[in-house]
UniProtKB/Swiss-Prot annotation:
NCBIfam families: fabA, PRK05174.1. It comes from Salmonella arizonae (strain ATCC BAA-731 / CDC346-86 / RSK2980). Pathway: Lipid metabolism; fatty acid biosynthesis. This is 3-hydroxydecanoyl-[acyl-carrier-protein] dehydratase. The active site is at 71. Necessary for the introduction of cis unsaturation into fatty acids. Catalyzes the dehydration of (3R)-3-hydroxydecanoyl-ACP to E-(2)-decenoyl-ACP and then its isomerization to Z-(3)-decenoyl-ACP. Can catalyze the dehydratase reaction for beta-hydroxyacyl-ACPs with saturated chain lengths up to 16:0, being most active on intermediate chain length. Gene3D superfamilies: Hotdog Thioesterase (3.10.129.10).
């Protein structure tokens, strides 16, 4: 039985990375440094732009985060692909929250737009995931749109984020 809370702490997210939150067969979040959120502040089975589920999570920004030291030297900026990966992470986390089992894999995205950046001077990144569809057959898959905001300003949008849960990834 999945503990379906509306919010999760950093320790909860780390427990997910160790395979402890959604059980031995549930999907896992990545461990640091690839875990791209500090907390989930809201999860619902309704709501969002399509009233089919919503997730909101946050990442605290500080100049010591690992990517600022290498991307780019003298011009530090969070790689846009990390924000995209965070959205995929949250789609997979939601599938586990719904009780889905398997190993999460990003399956694609229809369109991504970057209209801003995350600099070391920022305070907080907010991720918003609006679910469009959940497929619960042999393959469990989530389809969602996502947004990334920095200090309240929209900087990335993604349409048709897809994540699947697989029982066997050997042929993937």
């Amino acid at each position: 039985m999945v503990d379906k809370r509306e919010s999760y702490t950093k320790e909860d997210l780390l427990a997910s990375g160790r395979g402890e939150l959604f059980g031995a067969k549930g999907p896992q979040l990545p461990a640091p440094n690839m875990l791209m959120m500090d907390r989930v502040v809201k999860m619902t089975e309704t709501g969002g732009n399509f009233d089919k589920g919503y997730v909101e999570a946050e990442l605290d920004i500080n100049p010591d985060l690992w990517f600022f030291g290498c991307h780019f030297i003298g011009d530090p900026v969070m790689p846009g692909c990390l924000g995209l990966d965070a959205m995929w992470q949250l789609v997979g986390f939601y599938l586990g929250w719904l009780g889905g089992e398997g190993k999460g894999r990003a399956l694609g995205v229809g369109e991504v737009k970057f209209t801003g950046q995350v600099l070391p001077t920022a305070k907080k990144v907010t991720y918003r995931i609006h679910f469009k569809r959940i497929v619960n057959r042999r393959l469990i898959m989530g389809l969602a749109d996502g947004e990334v905001l920095v200090d309240g300003r929209l900087i990335y949008t993604a349409h048709d984020l897809k994540v699947g849960l697989f029982q066997d990834t050997s042929a993937f």
